[in-house]
Amino acid sequence: MSVSDKVEYYKIVKDILKSDEFQKRKTYKHHGDITVYDHSLAVSKLAYKWAKKLNRDYKAAAIGGLLHDFYFEPWQENQEKKPLLQKHGFVHAKEAVVNSYQYFPELMNKKIENIILRHMFPLNKIPPKYIEGWLVTLADKQVSLEVIKEPTALFQFFGYKRKKHLEAK
């Protein structure tokens, strides 16, 4: 990103980055060793960059990318057994929308809501409505997969503590 793009990007997201609530995500693990804060920042920057290049709404891409995982409880710490459709991958986008409106109502609109709500496609059946939503969805997948450096890391990516099927019998 150019210096002018970095300055512009920061102006768009500074209120989120300075928020005490968003800062807590520095302590939440995402996948592998990356935190939710670092993951969300990487997704946001990548979606912003792509949106600028494609002459799309880069502000919505930056904000939606930053808030797409704005949930309260690190999913790895929740040991509660839940039906499949109530697990983190299916519900955290709705929680992120609610939290985003609660903490950043002045930044939210229907486009950003849709970006956040639909970023888990195809896990969630309804795709993003806007190009910017697709950019955040794809950036999220790319950034998430970058943590997988070896095949066994794939199991930790999905929250499995042990790799039973890989252990010697």
Language-model segment annotations:
Residues 1-169:
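Metal-dependent phosphohydrolase cores
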